[in-house]
Amino acid sequence: MDVDLELLVRMITGYKYLNNNIPVASFENSMIELIHGDMIDADGLDYVCRDVWAGGYRNFTIDIDRLINSIEIVYNNTSGYSVAYNAKALNEIETVLNIKNFQYLYVIKHHKVLLEQYLLVEAMKFTACYHLDLPDDSADERDNALRSLCDYHAYITPKSLSQSKYILHRPTDDDFVALMKLYDTENMYIKQWFSRKYDATPLWKSKMEYFSVFKPVFQSLSEEEYKNIHTILMSPECKHFLCTQFNLQEKDIIVIEVKPKLRKLEERIFIKLNDNIKPYSELSHDMFSVVGTELPFCYMYINFNVLGVDDKIMHIKTIISRIKDFLLMELREKWDE
């Protein structure tokens, strides 16, 4: 069979030719992009359909046939060959973009998903200290222990863990679960991760709620000023303030930052409109019609079990009010400077 094996391998791996000025290389780069593109490709469309089905997104539908039938490889004197879409697929292109961004922000970065990931990492840090017979008194010691446990050499040669004598070789998820069980299932992080009964409760549960809650503080700030205040909210000083106000320990407060990495079309997708090739960004009225801006935000979780409160909702409002007071106090100090 007459097959261009080099092009086939490049299409699978996504390895494009560096010199796009050569017509043949430019055309083959467009072929590669169809299978292994940055924004929309064969695998990506398959994943989008799967995610819509598995995630139960009732607010998104895609006409895949319309999108595929609209694909062309076009040529212009400036950039050579490129993948373009017929204008009739504009709606499908925006839907694909919105699904990926929606999934990232509201599924991958959901407050429960992030908390579960945090607990797993913390559990594995203590587990690593135990199996490697290392101290676990400080955060740095625990971080270093986990890095040592997850060293890539374990994928090459067997590694005997000094404390438990467990042989770690080509580790999988099951190995790390076994290591946690061998350590201490009563460890606060391990216990929560296994049981899925989390002690910590989020003070807000979405990006929209976060900005709504702090609107009185944020509304008059520039983007740069907002980022400064966001840094203060993430700071140890803010956590210490809450510990003092509500008689908490630092371990009772978890703060997890979210830095949205939204997919932007910008100039990277081209639309064929009346025989003219236009960047999608020139035709799109709203590049973030579902998810909004890329400003960072955070989730803050409190262990209400140690507070012993009956009305959790009212107490959440009280804590948020104190956080606002702290932020405004910090703002005034900065303005006075």
Where are the language model's segments positioned?
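Histidine-centered, transition-metal-coordinating active-site segments
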Residues: 1-337
